[in-house]
Regions:
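Peripheral (often C-terminal) accessory segments that flank ATP-dependent C-N-forming ligase machineries
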Residues: 1-11, 306-413
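ATP-binding N-terminal substructure of ATP-dependent carboxylate-amine bond-forming enzymes
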Residues: 1-128, 135, 366, 372, ...
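A short glycine-rich, hydrophobically flanked beta-strand micro-motif that places a catalytic Asp/Glu
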Residues: 261-273, 320-323, 413
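Short acidic-glycine loop/turn motifs at beta-strand connectors
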Residues: 173, 202-209, 272-275, 340, ...
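A short beta-strand motif that forms the metal-chelation/ATP-contact edge
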Residues: 23, 159, 200, 276-285
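ATP-grasp fold ATP-binding core
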Residues: 133, 153-171, 183-199, 212-216, ...
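ATP-dependent carboxylate/phosphate-activation module, predominantly the ATP-grasp catalytic core
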Residues: 192-195, 199-260, 271, 283-307, ...
């Protein structure tokens, strides 16, 4: 009987099992990107500056203190980590747009599933971006370079050129420090209103740009201990009037045919009290909107992004991708909780760590990690009927997480 049973068991030759396509996610924080990569059916590896516990639970992570390669020696931590994955494609996460030296190095010797370095540098030069948009008759916020300051009357913002997450932004008035008058900063006319993001996907070849969707951004929320201009969350999908969306779609097209962007990219913009949108920044890589729109709308955007550079890899990976679970409500939000003071984290790691749906808490530090005041602690997620409902639930979730945070005395000078 045992022999007969073995005859009818299905035969699986493990030597013929094809591996999932591998990809290296590189950026300041890669957890959301890695989870999107998993949902798309790829096998991810990561290099980032946080190496959070939930990221480590699902992939191999190479932690680095900085993405800078100002010291271009083989002992540079970033270059050493990248060298271990020299044979697999690289996917850019947040912060990479501010590392021109690293982008140049990678483009010379690695396969990149992302926009070209030249295109990234164009849209990250504020004056060049504003002049380019004005040349095609788009309304833009006035921009001035750091060595040509406007009046200190509070109607301008001074921003780092290599900015991320709203860090380093201040109002340009009499209290602003003089060290902002350099080539590393620029001035942008101030406009008040809610902040939104739009997400696009563009093939490298000529053709239309796909408008993916809109999200509402949370900025400077005291409930999350965020600084005045600090990015601290996202809710989506968002809906805006048709005439506003039409203009946003046009911006997405211009960023491809005039500046050369491809793959996933996003823009941040403010809608003023008159209902007019004003572009404030371009993010030439996958953004926080990717995760929210994937989970809230049942999409697999990472595979669509990869298809812009390698259609066969994208098709192969989709064979491994599980169907997305149904949304739990109309909107999904993510909030970033910041440390109000120096603290130690005891946030428990969920078991198991989930990547195919929104976790209650993510970006979880290793137990006992000390986090300095003003630094991000973790992310919380919530579903709801609209932006206000989701935001209230996110703030409540943040209060629950704070129960696992312990104040720590400042380190001696």
């Amino acid at each position: 009987m045992h022999y007969i049973k073995k005859m009818f068991e299905p035969f699986v030759d493990e030597s013929l099992t094809l591996p999932r396509p591998r990809v290296l996610v590189l950026g300041a924080s890669t957890r959301a990107g890695v989870f999107s990569v998993l949902r798309a059916g790829f096998e991810p590896y990561a290099i980032d500056q946080f190496a959070d516990a939930d990221l480590r639970a699902l992939t191999t992570v190479e932690p680095v203190e900085s993405l800078s390669i100002a010291t271009k020696s083989t002992k540079n931590p970033v270059l050493s980590a990248i060298q271990k994955y020299s044979d697999i494609p690289i996917l850019y996460a947040g912060g990479m747009e501010n590392q021109p030296q690293l982008l140049e190095h990678l483009e010379r010797g690695h396969l990149i599933w992302g926009a070209d370095r030249a295109a990234i540098e164009q849209v990250r030069q504020p004056k060049h971006l504003a002049d380019g948009l004005a040349h095609v008759r788009q309304r833009v916020l006035p921009v001035q370079v750091g060595n040509d300051p406007p009046p200190r009357d509070g109607t301008w913002l001074v921003k780092p050129i290599a900015s991320a997450g709203g860090r380093g932004i201040t109002v340009w008035d009499e209290s602003a420090p003089h060290d902002k008058l350099d080539g590393k900063h620029y001035f942008q006319k101030r406009v008040e209103g809610p902040v939104y993001s739009a997400l696009f996907i563009a093939e490298k070849t000529p053709g239309d740009v796909r408008f993916v969707g809109l999200t509402r951004q949370l900025v400077g929320c005291p409930e999350l201990h965020a600084g005045q201009f600090a990015w601290c969350g996202i809710v989506g999908p968002a809906i805006l009037p048709v005439e506003v969306e039409f203009l946003i779609r046009r911006w997405g097209n211009i960023l491809k045919w005039k500046f050369g962007l491809s793959g996933l990219y996003g823009i941040d913009f403010i809608v003023d009290e008159a209902g007019a949108p004003w572009l404030i920044e371009v993010n030439p890589r996958m953004t926080g909107s990717v995760e929210i729109l994937e989970l809230a709308c049942g999409m697999q955007l990472l595979a669509d992004h990869v298809a812009c550079y390698d259609s066969s890899a994208a098709s192969f990976a989709r064979e491994f991708a599980a169907p997305p679970p149904p949304p739990q409500d109309d909107r999904l939000g993510r909030a970033i909780l910041y440390a109000p003071f120096r603290l130690k984290s005891h946030i428990p790691l969920p078991q198991p760590v989930v990547w195919n749906t929104a976790p209650p808490v993510a970006d979880i530090p290793e137990p006992g990690s000390v986090i300095e005041a003003g630094q991000p602690v973790c992310s919380v997620y919530a579903w709801g009927a609209d932006v206000d409902d989701v935001t209230a639930k996110l703030f409540a979730a943040a209060r629950q997480v704070e129960r696992h945070l312990e104040p720590v005395a400042d380190s001696p000078e």
